[in-house]
Amino acid sequence: MTDIAIVDYGMGNLRSVAKALEHVAPEAVIAVTNNPEVVRKAERVVVPGQGAMPDCLRELDRLGLREAVRDAAANKPFLGICIGLQMLFDSSEEGNVSGLGIVPGRVKRFPASAMKDEKGQKLKVPHMGWNQVHQSVGHSLWKNIANDSRFYFVHSYYVEPADADSAGHSAYPFSFTCAVAKDNIFAVQFHPEKSHAAGLTLLGNFVRWKPV
């Protein structure tokens, strides 16, 4: 049996995620896969993703992975990264598409009118680079990670949960949710595989996580 399945739907640098997981869990059986049955049988599932959410959802459907991802999000330790966070939500302003509807809320674009720093200078979209993450709640995946640690971001859209599912916030320039926690799901807007020690710690915590 595969210990960790990394869902491969052709949208993201999956090798960097796999390499980071191999580093923190050298004895684990890790599969980068587009096979729905491998995803269903894995003990843990990671859904990364980069690019446009409509394209990601279309590829999930083309490969027959949508229901396997939904089943994983309902039944086993599940980590979403970047678009893997956004697609969990009900809908997105990006292409006005419906998401998987697993986490109540929506995905919104950074509004051009609000993208100014405290000096009035224009901020670029996408939000790209290192930023602090404030831990909104205590969670097993934050273990041994200092509050307000810096993680690496690349995104033009952010999530807005409808319920109290937020587990972390960042600011660009306003506060936005960058991590959600719901039952056996933990999902982040930033890229832990690119976030050096803090990111590796989070991935190691995921490998050991036993949701109640």
Curated annotation (Swiss-Prot):
CDD domains: GATase1_IGP_Synthase. Keywords: Amino-acid biosynthesis, Cytoplasm, Glutamine amidotransferase, Histidine biosynthesis, Hydrolase, Lyase. Residues 3-212 form the Glutamine amidotransferase type-1 domain. Pfam families: GATase. Its EC number is 4.3.2.10, 3.5.1.2. Pathway: Amino-acid biosynthesis; L-histidine biosynthesis; L-histidine from 5-phospho-alpha-D-ribose 1-diphosphate: step 5/9. It comes from Nitrosospira multiformis (strain ATCC 25196 / NCIMB 11849 / C 71). InterPro entries: Class_I_gatase-like (IPR029062), GATASE (IPR017926), Imidazole-glycPsynth_HisH (IPR010139). IGPS catalyzes the conversion of PRFAR and glutamine to IGP, AICAR and glutamate. The HisH subunit catalyzes the hydrolysis of glutamine to glutamate and ammonia as part of the synthesis of IGP and AICAR. The resulting ammonia molecule is channeled to the active site of HisF. It is found in: Cytoplasm. GO terms for biological process: L-histidine biosynthetic process. GO terms for molecular function: glutaminase activity; imidazoleglycerol-phosphate synthase activity; lyase activity. Heterodimer of HisH and HisF. The active site is at 82 (nucleophile), 191, 193. The keyword Lyase applies. Its main location: cytoplasm. GO terms for cellular component: cytoplasm. Gene3D superfamilies: 3.40.50.880. The keyword Flavoprotein does not apply. It catalyses: 5-[(5-phospho-1-deoxy-D-ribulos-1-ylimino)methylamino]-1-(5-phospho-beta-D-ribosyl)imidazole-4-carboxamide + L-glutamine = D-erythro-1-(imidazol-4-yl)glycerol 3-phosphate + 5-amino-1-(5-phospho-beta-D-ribosyl)imidazole-4-carboxamide + L-glutamate + H(+); L-glutamine + H2O = L-glutamate + NH4(+). This is Imidazole glycerol phosphate synthase subunit HisH.
